[in-house]
Amino acid sequence: MQWGTSAACDKGDTMTTTDIRRANDRARTRTDWLDSKHSFNFGDHLQPGNDGHGTLVVFNDDRVAGGGGFGVHGHRDMEIVTWVLKGRLAHQDSEGNTGELYPGLAQRMSA
């Protein structure tokens, strides 16, 4: 299965490769409240050589249904960016801090 298309561009002494992964070509996880498309290896979806891009190891497109969401869980040594395109997202961290995100806002969390 081909997960994307690659194109090489000659930029002087170096070659730059672009790997385009269309939404329908990415691995997908679906539950009753989540539709997630994974750009890199994630969970049970493993493909040799698709381990990320440098230090970026997870880049998921998560669609969360109203009333759904991730339960309390920890993070370590991560920078997490959440960007809401539609609707609202409530967030609470392990220290009890809360916030709400809506379109036009992004959240960056260091954990």
Model-derived regions: residue spans:
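A short, N-terminal "cap"/entry segment at the start of jelly-roll beta-barrel domains
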Residues: 2-71, 101
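Short, conserved beta-strand element in jelly-roll/cupin
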Residues: 59, 75-90
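Short beta-strand segments in beta-sandwich/barrel cores
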Residues: 63, 87-91, 106-107
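Short histidine-centered beta-strand/loop micro-motifs
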Residues: 68-75, 92-94
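Short acidic-glycine-tyrosine-enriched beta hairpin
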Residues: 95-110
